[in-house]
Structure formats: C-alpha cells, structure tokens
Amino acid sequence: ISIGLVGSEMCIRDRGMVANQSEIVNDHIAFRTMGVKNLGIKSFEKIFIEHGYKKMDFYHFDLKKLDAYWYAPPSSDLPRIFISELKVNYLSTTAQKIIMKYTDSVKSDPVDGIDLNNSKQVSEYLQTPLWRLPTLKDYDDLMSESEYAAWVIYNRYYLNHYTISVHDLPGEYCNLEKFNHFVKSLGIKLNKSGGEVKVSKDKLLRQSSSVANQIEASFQNGEKKLIAGSYVEFAERSILPEFINLNKSQIMRKHRREGFETGNADKIFESTFT
C-alpha cells in the first residue's frame, strides 16, 4: 500500500490541494478475515466495538463466498471500518483442508488475549501473524479457487486498503473522474473491473481503486513469488437530496450518502486480482 498511498498523498500535498497530509480525510479502512472458529468478523469486530464503533449494514457476496459489515465511528473525524469474511465452509473440501492446516493453530479467540484499551497491544496484534507462513503450493492451490483465500492465508489480517475521501478535497479534485485523471498521471494503475468508477444504484456513492501493488513474497522453504499486496481506494459520497440546498460551508458527513454498496464493493475486491 505504501507506494500508491504515500505517493498519491504526497502529490496531493505538493499540488497545493491541502496544506499537509493530515488534512486528507480517510473515508474508511478495510480488513479481510477468515470465517473459521476463533477468527472472522465475530472476533475482529471486538476491537472496534470496544472503541465505540457501531455495527451497521450486512453485505453478502455470493460468487466470492463473502460476508461483510461496515461499522460507523463514534465521531465524524474517524474513518468507517469495513470488515469482510470468507465463508470457508462454502469452499471445496480441498481448500478447506488447506486453510484449516494453518488456522487450526489458533486455539482460542486471539482478541480476547489483548487489552483493547492498550493501543500498543492492538497495533501489535494487527501486525502479528496469526498462523505460520504458507507454502507456495498451498497459496497457489487456494488461488485457483479463491483469490481472497490466497490473499488472507499469506497477508493474514494486514490492512487491505485505505480510502481517500475525494469529496473532501478542494476545488476540481473533489470530482472522482478528475481525481482519477490525476492519479493516473502519477503512474498509478486503476482497477477497471466494473469500470474505473463504480456507481451505486442510487448514484450517490462513487468509488475507484488502484490495482494492488505486487510484492515479492517469501514462502516456506525460501520460495518466492510476486503476489498482490494492499491498495488505495478513492470514494466520492454525494450530498443527500434532502440537503442539496445547504450552503457548502454547512455540509457535514451526516449530510452525505452513508454506508456501502454490494455491487461496488464486489468490484473493489478485485483490486487484488493482479
């Protein structure tokens, strides 16, 4: 995520769109999880609920065998959270056995073992591998059935993507098409699945994303392969019709389209299809 994210943020600052990178609003952060005993959404969401996040809408992705929820932050200066989960029991017996070979080492809910009010412990948890490094063969075998499964078996619970809130940028760059043009001028490749701009049914949520950076991954026995890492998303949330006559200075987060859209998210997942 570092190349695309840091590069685009620095260029946003250098173009004078914002005075510093801290002014770039983070629309949401997304994580991927495995839906197995002691893990998955039920475990991972505790971190955010403990800090005042509210569980919101449910989403299901039939073809990808995924479920997801989004979580509203306790204050508008914090990002939304989007947590998805692979329904492992919907996969083939072969894929399930590969996944369980690694996740069965997690004997209890790991979140229960950390102090959720200790930011250092939470940060360390998010960066600590929950199971051993997979073999390249296991990774490839999972990839042949579920890209999501392969991504998680290697990356574990590492941040999947971060999202720049385009509508909060000044001037012409608050338009997603114009912002995409800027992003492409930096040499960042966009995910074209479903079109460069994914549009919700109500036309009020528009999203784009970069194609995930490829990283050289080291597997068991020292084998290496280029695989998908993380990526950056760009979201434009339109003002709700009932607030369209408000002055621009009055517009707050609550006046804009909330939540997510299954059709959009389904294509955003494919940012790691590299």
Describe the predicted segments one by one:
Residues 10-11:
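Active-site loops and adjacent core secondary-structure elements that bind or stabilize anionic groups
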Residues 45, 50-160:
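Internal, hydrophobic cores of structured domains that mediate oligomerization or house catalytic pockets
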Residues 1-7:
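Single conserved hydrophobic/aromatic residue that forms the stacking wall/gate
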Residues 112-231:
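A contiguous, surface-oriented mixed alpha/beta subdomain in the mid-to-C-terminal portion of proteins
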Residues 38-57, 171-186:
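Amphipathic alpha-helical segments
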Residues 34-36, 58-63, 86-88, 169, ...:
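An acidic- and aromatic-residue-enriched active-site/binding cleft used to recognize and process polar
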